[in-house]
Structures are given as C-alpha cells and as structure tokens.
Amino acid sequence: MASEEIIREVYKVLEERRDNPIDSYTSKIMQDSDKKAEDKILEKVAEECGEVLLAAKNDENLVYESVDLIFHTLLILVYKGIEIDEIFEEFARRRH
C-alpha cells in the first residue's frame, strides 16, 4: 500500500469513529465534552512529542514513537474537522 493510501485509510477510520462512535480508544477520546475531548487529544500530542524527542536522543523506538505522534496529530485534525486533502495540498504547496 502506498504511503498516501495508508494515511488516507487511517484518516477515514478516525473520521468514522468520530461520526459513528464504537467502543474504541479513538471514539472515547473524541466523544468527551467538547473542551475536555480537545484537551485530552492535545495532551496526547504533547506527550507523544516528548516521546519522539527522547526516542531520537536515545536512538530507541523512533519509528514507533513517530507513528504515535503522527496518529495523534491526525486525530486532532479529524476532531477539528480538517479534511485530509487540505493536508496533502499544504505539503504540495510547500514542495515548490
């Protein structure tokens, strides 16, 4: 599977869990009262940032921790209603 495809697939799952909650981590974190849910997601992004920094410094689990950070970054984008194409368009804009 191409890298863009897997990101789109993960994004779609996150959107589905936001719109049709099931008993999952992502559904639960997004279904709290609005401010509390946002705070929880942002706390996870901050936590994962720290873990990426430590992993890079210690040369341990950098890929694993980076995927956690990317996942939680995608989660806040979905929560905020950002469309996946906006992200790819911004990457394309910066490429030139």
Swiss-Prot record:
GO biological process, one term: L-histidine biosynthetic process
Record keyword Cytoplasm present: yes
CDD domains per record: NTP-PPase_HisIE_like
Pfam families recorded: PRA-PH (PF01503)
UniProt pathway: Amino-acid biosynthesis; L-histidine biosynthesis; L-histidine from 5-phospho-alpha-D-ribose 1-diphosphate: step 2/9
GO CC terms, sorted: cytoplasm
Keyword S-adenosyl-L-methionine: no
Localization: Cytoplasm
GO molecular function, a single term: phosphoribosyl-ATP diphosphatase activity
Domain of life: Archaea
Catalytic activity: 1-(5-phospho-beta-D-ribosyl)-ATP + H2O = 1-(5-phospho-beta-D-ribosyl)-5'-AMP + diphosphate + H(+)
EC number, UniProt record: 3.6.1.31
The entry's keywords: Amino-acid biosynthesis, ATP-binding, Cytoplasm, Histidine biosynthesis, Hydrolase, Nucleotide-binding
Homology family: Belongs to the PRA-PH family.
Name of this chain's protein: Phosphoribosyl-ATP pyrophosphatase
